[in-house]
């Protein structure tokens, strides 16, 4: 099965992929608006033939934005699952530092967060 992990943001969306048991950071989507985020993500999902989409759900106000994003993807008939993303950004930054990532490469933190979200899902499915 082909999986896509998503760390949703209103400016940047981190993406990670997996075709088995190991999630890998993939790319960052730059978005201008909520509708732009839904459109760009939907295109990637369809073009990539992903069978399962895993979206991290944070607490608080951003959680409401993520819920709206998930709802918009659901309305397009996409197979979306929501998982807790508590500490995913912190873990992602820790992994990047341990791997010696430069400040320039740390701009990919959202993709690493998406990989943490997806890996947690894969480990617990």
What is the predicted role of each segment?
Residues 2-6, 10-125:
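Phosphate- and other anionic-substrate recognition elements at nucleic-acid/protein interfaces
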């Amino acid at each position: 099965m082909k999986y896509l992990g998503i760390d949703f943001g209103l400016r940047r969306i981190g993406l990670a992929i997996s075709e088995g048991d190991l999630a890998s950071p993939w790319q960052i989507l730059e978005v201008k608006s909520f509708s732009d985020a839904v459109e760009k993500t939907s295109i990637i999902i369809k073009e990539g033939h992903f069978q399962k989409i895993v979206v991290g759900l944070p607490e608080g106000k951003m959680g409401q934005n993520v819920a709206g994003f998930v709802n918009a993807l659901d309305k397009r008939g996409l197979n979306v699952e929501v998982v807790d993303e508590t500490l995913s950004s912190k873990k992602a930054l820790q992994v990047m530092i341990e791997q010696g990532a430069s400040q320039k490469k740390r701009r990919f933190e959202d993709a690493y967060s998406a990989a943490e979200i997806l890996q947690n899902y894969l480990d617990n499915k």
